[in-house]
Structure formats: structure tokens, C-alpha cells
């Protein structure tokens, strides 16, 4: 997700190969203090931190992640699509009990955005009964049927990618990784779109997670 914010690279924050503590936990200021990322807005109740473990070779994509706690509301300017057409917007999360429940909004006017559906519980991984998940088998046709069932529930397994553990993010050992399909719709290549992530919980300790 940090690739959406050029300042993270130009200011030597992202992918910094340094194990010094101050470079591993970088706090992002609120907009009212200093608008650090041009492509991101956050409310005053958002406490955001960038966790950089590039020097430790974390299993996260590019060995980093972004987290926020508080009664957060974060709006992100999305990059353009290459051509107009029907696209899916997906949100990948490593689910655990520390995560929160998020309402997503999407639109081309960040002052008037529509919810993408019901709030998403980030504590729920692939094994939850609502997803339709089953572990991959040797039968590729059956695996495709399971994938289709999950897509009907707006879920996907982790990506078919190599992890530090030497396997795929689709493996049963990685079933806490889930991709949520937030929407499928026509996207105009000539428009700018935004995604808003807003906590719907009273708790200010549950996490927003972006990898």
C-alpha cells in the first residue's frame, strides 16, 4: 500500500534497509498537524504507523505494512486504470483478533462517496463458514469450483505467490490471509477515484491493516 504514496520513497522511509528502531516504526502525522502524504487524508482520531522490516525480510509484501488505530477515517486517492472497463477492487488482509471492522466507500468525488457494501470484519480469515473456503486439492477443477464459491461470497484465497515459508499464500497454513472483493464495476480511465476506510467500532484499539 505504501507504493501509493511517493513521499514514502522520496523521503527514504519505504524499503529502507535499516534495522534501527526509528526506521522500523514511523508515525504518520495527522492532516491537521502536517499533510504528509498528498494521496491520503485522515481524521484527527486516526493514529497511523508505518512498520518497516525490510532489513528483517518479513513475509509481508515488500516486508512492510501500514496500521492505524483509533476511530479512524482514511481516504486514499487511487492510481488510474490503464483503460476504461470493468474492474474489481480487492482488499487483502491478514486476519487476526487485533483487527477492526471497516466500512469501505468508493467514488470519484471524495466528498460524496457510496459504501461498497456492508462493513467488513477484518478478524475473519478464509476458514470462516461464511467464505466457502476449502483447502486446495490435486483436482484443479474442484479447486476452481471452490474459488468460484468464494468469489460468490466476495472472498478470495491468498494470491498464488511464493511466501518466505516456501509455499503459496493459498495454502491452508496461510488461511488467515483473505482477499475481499469490495466491488466490481465500470471504471473510467479519465476519472480519479478514491477509497475511504472508516472504523465502525466504538473501540479505539482495533486495527486498520494495509499491506
Where are these regions (language model features)?
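Extracytoplasmic
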Residues: 1-211
Amino acid at each position: 500500500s505504501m507504493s501509493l504514496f511517493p513521499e514514502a520513497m522520496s523521503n527514504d522511509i519505504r524499503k529502507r534497509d535499516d534495522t534501527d528502531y526509528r526506521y522500523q516504526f514511523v508515525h504518520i502525522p495527522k492532516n491537521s498537524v502536517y499533510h504528509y502524504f498528498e494521496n491520503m487524508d485522515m481524521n484527527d482520531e486516526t493514529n497511523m504507523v508505518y512498520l518497516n522490516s525490510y532489513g528483517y525480510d518479513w513475509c509481508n509484501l515488500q516486508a512492510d505494512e501500514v496500521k492505524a488505530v483509533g476511530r479512524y477515517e482514511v481516504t486514499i486517492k487511487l492510481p488510474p486504470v490503464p483503460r476504461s472497463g470493468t474492474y474489481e477492487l480487492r482488499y487483502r488482509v491478514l486476519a487476526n483478533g487485533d483487527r477492526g471492522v471497516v466500512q469501505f466507500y468508493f467514488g470519484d468525488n471524495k466528498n460524496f462517496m457510496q459504501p461498497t457494501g456492508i462493513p467488513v470484519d477484518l478478524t475473519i480469515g478464509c476458514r470462516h463458514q461464511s467464505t466457502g473456503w476449502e483447502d486446495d486439492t490435486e483436482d484443479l477443477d474442484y479447486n476452481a469450483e471452490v474459488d468460484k464459491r468464494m468469489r460468490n461470497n466476495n472472498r478470495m484465497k491468498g494470491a498464488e505467490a511464493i511466501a518466505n515459508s516456501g509455499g503459496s499464500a493459498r495454502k491452508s497454513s496461510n488461511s488467515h490471509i483473505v482477499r475481499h472483493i469490495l466491488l466490481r464495476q465500470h471504471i473510467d480511465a479519465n476519472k480519479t477515484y478514491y477509497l475511504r476506510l472508516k472504523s465502525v467500532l466504538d473501540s479505539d484499539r482495533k486495527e486498520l491493516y494495509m499491506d
